[in-house]
Amino acid sequence: MKHERDELTRTGIAAVVLSLALLLSAPQGAFAQEQEPPQETHDGLTLVPDRKVAVAYIDSEADLSVYDRIMILDCHVAFKKDWQRDQKRSGSRICISSSDMEKIKADVAELFREVFTEKLGGDGGYEIVEAAGDDVLLVRPAIIDLDITVPDTMSAGRSSTYTSSAGAATIYIELYDSVTGDIFARAADRKAARSVGGYMSYTNRVTNRADARRMLGTWAELLRDRLDEFHGK
């Protein structure tokens, strides 16, 4: 079962996230004129207007009120294209190796699970489980186009800089019935971690993590709010 879900994650993300990433990275004018998302997906989901996320599709007949428990798959994480090369060209004193990038991705995936478990489980009242079941909603997440201003690496030492943003990322989430595999929703959104008031601020690995927690917390709360609507909370 786990192998099947892992394979589903790899193939699904490769097929769908790429197109959403192109939509989210396009200039606003180009998005409106040339790259409007389709009204319906290949698997029957319908595009819905949502002021809080960039792209959202749902199964209009889905009833999520029957799901009181949530199973969160491991979060797939991918850096912005050529991020490592751009770090070298920027003249940064921090040398980022491929192993450093793998560690950062693992840390981001772990932080995703931690924050979403807190927001959906502890704060939201939904039971977080590790196995499928009739009342278990499966959450399949991915973070793509990850762009970190000051990378957090064990070899970086004390690294910091002044910047107006610690970085940015695009989140992608799908919701499934954990038993049947029926898909209920798909959404993607991009956010940047901005300094309070838009001013330059001192950014380092500690503030990076705090900013990432806030961004993930915002997304987790949005998902929780949508689930609460189905449950009449």
Model-based region annotation:
Residues 1-10:
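N-terminal secretory signal peptides that target proteins for export/translocation
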Residues 14-26:
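Bacterial N-terminal signal peptides
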Residues 85, 101-105, 149-154, 193:
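Extracellular/periplasm-exposed beta-strand and loop segments of Gram-negative cell-envelope proteins
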Residues 118, 122-182, 194-203:
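Surface-exposed short loop/turn segments
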Residues 93-101, 163-164, 179-225:
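Short secondary-structure boundary motifs at beta->alpha junctions and helix caps
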Residues 30-110, 201, 225-233:
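A structural "domain/chain start" motif
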